[in-house]
A protein has these predicted regions:
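Acidic donor-binding loop of glycosyltransferase active sites
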Residues: 318-332, 345
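Short hydrophobic beta-strand element within catalytic cores of glycosyltransferases
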Residues: 346-349, 359
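A short, well-ordered alpha-helix in the C-terminal region of glycosyltransferases
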Residues: 391-419
Length: 431
């Protein structure tokens, strides 16, 4: 098959891009021809298709009034993207199009490329976040509270609650985008939506998507991650034990809750146990101030190591005693947890979104209530006791590795996905 994969970012930015590039790798292993459609950017990985990538767009920086008007229009519908995608389709002649992150920088205008209708090309969309039912995509309102207000299709709630970064203008633009896509029936042009978690599928159905349009397929792990899980070597740093948070330092990730909980626990924790925070983001200064205010002991026991390469992150995950997923928002199917499991590192995870589908109390980790310092504090104390019980800890490590090997096979995912591709091709072409 010839497959076009679509994603706004063409470099390893986050979990969506891990999936996007992993998909290309897995499909090529099976002998399929893969092409890309993305946004231009200085960090992009080289691609033979880059001459048709869309112009870079940044909706977060300061802009003049004419720029804002232009941005508002192209955010909702990009004529440039439609025309360039049509040119790519004419050149590649795809059998299937598989979209990932496309809203705002690319837009769903590409679904109007005439080639798709003329040649009955099936389109899939992997739902990495909640943009299909929430203009703010994380199902949090402007105050950072969990929010289901737009599930009934009334997207004016986004503007009313200033859900996008507390900004009336940005929330209004997001609302207009959602209303426009609903009015045009854009999502009806997608043949299958892939939900990586059962929770995601349930929310899409609550948001009005037909059950037959949404298929659950848990994300896969790349082969090197699977190889790491199969290796089974315990690389935990027993001499210098630490808990590990890795990810974006943002409010929805709950890193502030984690720091507060760890500081609260310091008098009760083993003297050697540290907290390592890997990543960067808007909450970094707040976290640094919390640590400094807590005094010298906290400063000695909490380390911010900043952004880490993939290789460095794997080393951190392998050596950590426990990883922490303290999210406030409804995470979909976090790759960070799968990568920790593959390293034999159990996880303390918030009971929210798709996290409980991965982190099961007493089996693959420990659980806590989202955004609750006391609950996370108690989970950390339970984790400290677990680490000291080497037999119970080793059993949990084995459970984590088994989960990845049994549930996250790249080969099986690719075979299931290509079978779905073929089913849609046959259906659309009347075979």
């Amino acid at each position: 098959m010839k497959i076009i994969l679509v994603n706004k970012f063409h470099y390893l930015k986050g979990g969506s891009e891990t999936y996007y590039f992993g998909l290309a790798e897995g499909l090529r292993v099976l002998g399929h021809e893969v092409h890309f459609f993305a946004m231009e950017g200085p960090d992009n990985i080289s691609s033979e298709d880059s001459d048709l990538f869309v112009s870079a767009k940044d909706y977060n920086g300061p802009t003049s009034l004419p720029q804002k008007v232009s941005a508002a229009t192209s955010l909702i519908y990009s004529k440039e993207a439609k025309e360039k995608f049509q040119a790519l389709c004419e050149r590649v002649q795809p059998d299937v199009v598989h979209m990932n992150l496309v809203h705002r920088q690319i837009t769903l205008s590409i679904l109007d490329a005439p080639y798709l209708k003329q040649h009955r090309v099936p389109v899939l969309f992997t739902s990495h976040d909640y943009i299909l039912v929430c203009p703010n995509y994380v199902m949090l309102d402007g105050s950072g509270n969990l929010c289901d207000a737009c599930l009934d299709g009334h997207f004016g709630n986004c503007l009313k609650r200033k859900c996008v970064k507390g900004s009336t203008a940005k929330s209004g633009m997001a609302m207009l985008e959602a209303e426009y896509l609903k009015l045009r029936g854009s999502y009806k042009k997608i043949d299958r939506i892939v939900a990586p978690s059962q929770f995601m599928r349930e929310k899409l159905l609550e948001g009005g998507f037909p059950a037959q349009q949404v298929v659950y397929m848990q994300n896969f792990a790349k082969q090197e991650i699977l190889d790491n899980a199969a290796d089974g070597t315990d690389r935990t740093d027993w001499d210098n034990p630490y808990l590990l948070f890795f990810g974006r330092l943002s409010s929805e990730k709950g890193v502030d809750v984690l720091v507060d909980a760890f500081i609260k626990d310091l008098p009760s924790l083993p003297a050697k146990l540290r907290l390592v925070i890997a990543g960067d983001g808007p909450e970094r200064q707040n976290i640094e101030e919390k640590i400094a205010a807590a005094g010298a002991v906290a400063s000695d026991r909490i380390e911010l190591v900043g952004f880490q390469s993939s290789a460095d992150m794997q080393r951190h995950a392998e050596k950590a005693s426990l990883a922490i997923a303290s999210s406030r928002w409804r995470e979909n199917m976090p790759y960070s947890i799968v990568e920790a499991f593959a390293s034999g590192t159990p996880v303390i995870g918030s009971e929210i979104g798709g996290i409980p589908e991965l982190v099961v109390e007493g089996q693959t980790g420990l659980t806590c209530k989202p955004g609750d310092v006391d609950s996370l504090s108690q989970a950390i104390l339970r984790g400290a006791r677990l680490i000291e019980n080497h037999e119970a800890y080793a059993a949990m490590q084995a459970n984590c590795r088994s989960y990845v090997l049994e549930r996250c096979s790249q080969e099986k995912y690719m075979k299931d996905l290509t079978a779905l591709y073929q089913e849609l091709i046959d259906s659309k072409k009347g075979n």
